[in-house]
Amino acid sequence: ISWKKSMRWADHELYWGRPLKSILCCFDNKTLEFVYHHLVSSNITFIDKDFEKKTRKFVSFKDYLAFFKSKNIILDNKKREQFIEDRLNKIAKKENLKILLNSNLLNEVTNIVEKPNIIKCRFDKRFLEIPDDILVTTMQVHQKYFPTFDTRDNLTNNFFLVADNKDIKGLIKVGNENVVEARLNDAKFFWDKNKTQNLVKGISNLKKLSYFEGLGS
């Protein structure tokens, strides 16, 4: 498997999409042993919990599935995506909101969480003066949030985020609301600044720009 961007673990020479720490390989209730670079497969995997490295042995795939299910971790990608979509729609309906469910964003957040939890947040209504496209781009592209609309299809100041755990103390909600507040303050500043510029002159300035495909990121 080739990756555009790879990482390696410590001083080992193995490059992968993410640093590999261990390989769990079992079949028919038996451990299949093989060597891949510096790693030797086993029936043990590492579980990060409260910043501690803990090990867990598995004798079968059934045992493996049961363990993660008990931790509310959804291993199956399709089931995890469906769970997120269903929860988003259910909460939005309960709040009398319409959710902007972008399929690319849904796929992206599905792949960055293990035990998804939907959290409803909001930003200051004064930012609704900014054009919808700017607000939606800020929420979807930069923050991975799901914007919402009211029954008249007007963008609201409510949005949903998909967290990777329960927000018991409400810190995830507050933290994300603070982050989007800063983002929207920046967006409003540049929007207000752009409104003072002459549009025709701005278009003519595009002639001064040069575009190079594949340069930078």
Write out the residue ranges for each language-model feature:
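Long, basic N-terminal domains or extensions that often function
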Residues: 1-129, 133-135
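Catalytic nucleotidyl-transfer cores of nucleotide-processing enzymes
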Residues: 100-216
